[in-house]
Amino acid sequence: MSDANKRINIQIGIEVEVVQKQDQSSGELTEGVVKKILTKSPNHPYGIKVILETGEVGRVKNILDNFLS
């Protein structure tokens, strides 16, 4: 399971890439900063769902901030 699938690795204020619902078929990623974490479970196979500061909603595919190291 990737880091983006574990809620513990997602924090408000970090920079991430998400895939929005309408972009699931194309896989187009949207970059932004996490405003709120929507997924309540500790992990999710398709990525943790978040709201970005822009108001866009998507599932995290990549964590761009390197706070894990």
Where are these regions (language model features)?
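Basic/aromatic-rich interaction segments and small domains that mediate binding to polyanionic partners
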Residues: S2-L68
